[in-house]
């Protein structure tokens, strides 16, 4: 793990990475990670893990369009899908740079958490697979509610990664017990002014996050429909928003899966089509 941040040591850190192969690199700067990606990707061995954090969420989410175009060559839209767009735009940038070095990316975990984007990918050296990187690049077209296309049209965001954003086999190995052991810390790790209530709240947040990641891993590892609960009422023409529980039960009765996603806004993923989602929402009012 070679922590990277902008400062006097940046050139030195890049030189270290280029001169020695690593199996695991974590790029975690303040702001955009773009200037570090080329060196980091070159420095990964034939098979290795690259983790990237981006805090320039205004660019990735679409509110800073000139920065997005300059850094990522992409455009975003400020709406319910901007958080998912942000992770996919970052993944597309990593995939493009990796392909320049004959490497392909295989997503492990991608999420928008608080005020940053965090992605983990497995890099593999392969000219043949790297040459196919564009097969997973496209645009999110705002239709009903959206679809991915390899060409932009109408109201769109992208280009972005349109392939899987999770690896279910890996993510489903996560357990609440293990996460609490690693992330919750010891009593000496907590701020001095934290009460028992604060500590308990922190533990519950860890449990909730791991549960959502584990439950959604299977769907996010394949083609899926992402639905924003706050948009569903208007789309279905109903006044009261259906609960997540009611939607999950209704979709299950029709033979479909659904999982609550770890997003800043209430969203779920499903393998159902949009018309089925609307029918369930109307029957759940």
What feature does the model see in each segment?
Residues 47-56:
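Conserved beta-strand signature within the Rossmann-like core of class I S-adenosyl-L-methionine
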Residues 15-23:
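A short acidic, Gly/Pro-enriched loop at the edge of an enzyme's catalytic core
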Residues 37-48:
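A short glycine-rich, Lys/Arg-flanked "PGG" loop and its adjoining helix->strand segment in the class I
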Residues 1-12:
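Single conserved hydrophobic/aromatic residue that forms the stacking wall/gate
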Residues 67-80:
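Conserved Class I S-adenosyl-L-methionine
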Residues 86-99:
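Short alpha-helix
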Residues 114-119, 124-285:
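Polybasic, low-complexity RNA-engagement segments
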Residues 22-35:
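A short SAM/SAH-binding and catalytic strip from SAM-dependent methyltransferases
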């Amino acid at each position: 793990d070679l922590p990277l941040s902008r400062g006097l040591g940046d050139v030195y850190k890049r030189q270290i990475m280029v001169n020695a192969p690593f199996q695991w690199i974590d790029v975690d700067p303040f702001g955009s990670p773009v200037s570090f990606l080329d060196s980091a990707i070159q420095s990964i061995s034939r098979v290795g893990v690259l983790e990237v954090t981006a805090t320039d969420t205004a660019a990735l989410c679409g509110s800073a369009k000139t920065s997005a175009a300059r850094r990522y060559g992409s455009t975003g839209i400020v709406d319910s899908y901007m958080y998912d767009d942000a992770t996919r735009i970052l993944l597309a940038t990593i995939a493009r740079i990796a392909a320049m070095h004959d490497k392909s990316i295989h997503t492990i975990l991608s999420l928008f958490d608080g005020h940053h984007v965090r992605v983990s990918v497995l890099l593999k050296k392969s000219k043949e697979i790297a040459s196919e990187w564009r097969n997973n690049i496209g645009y999110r077209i705002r239709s009903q509610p959206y679809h991915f296309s390899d060409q932009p049209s109408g109201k769109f965001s992208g280009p972005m990664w349109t392939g899987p954003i999770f690896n279910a086999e890996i993510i489903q190995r996560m357990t609440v017990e293990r996460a609490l052991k690693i992330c919750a810390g010891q009593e000496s790790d907590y701020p001095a002014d934290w009460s028992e209530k604060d500590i308990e709240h922190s533990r519950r947040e860890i449990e909730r996050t791991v549960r959502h990641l584990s439950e959604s891993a299977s769907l996010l590892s394949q083609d899926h429909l992402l639905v924003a609960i706050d948009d569903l009422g208007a789309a279905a023409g109903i006044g009261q928003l259906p609960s997540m529980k009611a939607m999950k039960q209704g979709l299950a009765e029709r033979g479909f899966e659904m999982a609550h996603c770890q997003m800043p806004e209430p969203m779920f993923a499903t393998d159902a089509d949009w018309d089925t989602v609307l029918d369930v929402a109307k029957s759940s009012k």
